[in-house]
């Protein structure tokens, strides 16, 4: 029986891991498996440069930042499994989580599965990605665009 299971390994998942592990709750995180649609570490794994996050005065790549988050969570005792959760039962306690053939029970589950960028499906979107087309207005809004 687990105290806490965290589903997801983006910034929210690692923040949850940090707080719960520091509270001696010994969290178990399912970071997911690398596949066409899923990337452990969340959307930041595809971000080339992060300049708007405290603690990185020179900027950092998304993968470097997520590696730091993972290292810090593991330092405090978070156990991280590279498996994808396929089913969750929240109807009765203890809660149940399925991953492959394994079933896990937990007193609490934190779902931190993030978000996906939504595109219009236009042919030109891919062509102009990061050159005028963006999935993050707050991230990319301050960057100079459309220079000659």
Task: Kindly give the residue locations of the regions a language model identified.
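FAD-binding core/adjacent interface of flavoenzyme oxidoreductases
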Residues: 1-7, 22-23, 28-35, 80-147
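Alpha-helix N-cap/loop-to-helix initiation residues
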Residues: 13, 59-62, 118, 142-143
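Gly/Ala-rich phosphate-binding loop of Rossmann-like dinucleotide-binding domains
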Residues: 17, 21
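N-terminal Rossmann-like dinucleotide/flavin-binding domain of flavoprotein oxidoreductases
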Residues: 40, 45-103
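Glycine-rich Rossmann-fold phosphate-binding loop(s) that bind the pyrophosphate
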Residues: 8-12
